[in-house]
Amino acid sequence: MVLPPILTRLVLVLSMAFAAHPLAAQTRPAPGGGEPPVVAPGVQIAALGEAMRIADVIAVMREEGLQYGSSLEAELFPDRGGPRWQAVVGLIYDADTMRKRFDAAFEAEVGRDPGAIAGMLDFFGSERGQRILQLEIEARRALLDESAEEAAKIKVEDMSARNDPRLDLLQEFAEANDLIELNVAGALNSNLAFYRGMAEGAAFDEALSEEQMLADVWSQEGDVRRETEEWLYPYLALAYGPLSDSDLRDYIAFSRTPEGRRLNGATFAAFDAVFSAISHDLGRAAAKQMQGEDI
């Protein structure tokens, strides 16, 4: 049984800018040349998560998840889910649980290099950084609408046909942040977690070994990569359309700094933890639904 690819749209960071936060000022030298106040790493990381507007990002991801739950029902057990399945999906995509999982993983990752946090906040704690963040969230929410997603895809096709140099910049941004590879890896991890959940729920006639599940998931790599690219560039074109080339180049430059790379890796790792857990729970719940059991 080959499951439909689960393209979990992990946050496209550095496609997570930060709003201005008082912590950015706290890390600068004190007036008169004195030492700046010491801020505990845990406090810094918590402030960074709030500055990144993770709650708003998770709210959009929850909406994406509810839509995906409906698609999963149509694929695996058409017209047999109903309100009960919708309620289960809503619990699995519980925003508070998602946030707790994100925070735990994010703190562990960023905590390895707390000295980088000030640089992250310095870059994004500006009017431009706030604007970038708002554009990213608005674009992600807009793409919940299929017509908006289709329009964004057509725009990218037109940019490609015209050899628009802006598309080159978007590709440079994606490469600087390794967005294709990290999203593909995250999606495959989520697919494997879904498989494991299905196996735990006894969805298969015969037990599958870990090797069999890994092989089946890896066979989806090409499809997942194609879907990632088909979603990523329309998203980037929509989100960064209002930005000047100069602003986008500065964003790319920051992405290549040690702080930018650290943040990128930490955010992907944190959302990978979130979506692996969600996918496992979805797989187990889907297996029980397919068998007509109480979830």
What feature does the model see in each segment?
Residues 214, 222-295:
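A cross-kingdom marker for long, charged
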